[in-house]
Amino acid sequence: GIRMEINDVTVTLAATDRFRLAVRTFEWDPFAQFSDSAVLIPSKRLSETAKTFAATSTAPVELALGGTDEELGGEGLLGIVGENRRTTTRLLDAQFPPFRTLLPQSHTAIATMDIASLAASIKRVSLMSDRGAQVRLAFANGEVVLTAGGDDSGEAEETLPVRYWGEPMTIAFNPSYVLDGLSVIEDTTVTFGFTNPNPPAII
């Protein structure tokens, strides 16, 4: 499921597949004072609803949680109302992992680079590795060296410029996971935050 945390200023969505954690926070404007709430929503239903609303209108949507109005969001329901339609979904009665404990509050190294160049390089070097094998990124001296492979199939290597702060570091990623993350960033550059090569990195 997708965890939705709501207060009177922001809505935060969090989801995980046990290997990756995605978090998105955006502002909203409630009609009335809103007490802090956290619910778990079926991910497939919420994703389908978002796609349907986005395809039919660009107008803002309304959220309704709890209360007695079954049409908008009765007890145990989340209501979503758009310009031309409305829908409700039943909430899940389950616990979501305490995801904020997985997000480091500080970093020992930070790297910023061009998204298009990085994505293209990852796609090229990963051709030399087996499906699901990792791509290694070595950061140092204003550049990052991407490598993959190294067995009988050969090895691929590419170098890209990077704005890097921290000690030299090599970290390995599943290329598909990185490409998925890069594909949803609405910018031309991406910043990675590291604590050391082993714990998860933040994009």
Regions found by a protein language model. Give the residues of each.
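Basic, Lys/Arg-rich DNA-contacting stretches centered on the C-terminal catalytic core
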Residues: 101-104
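DNA polymerase processivity clamps
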Residues: 1-25, 31-92, 106-203
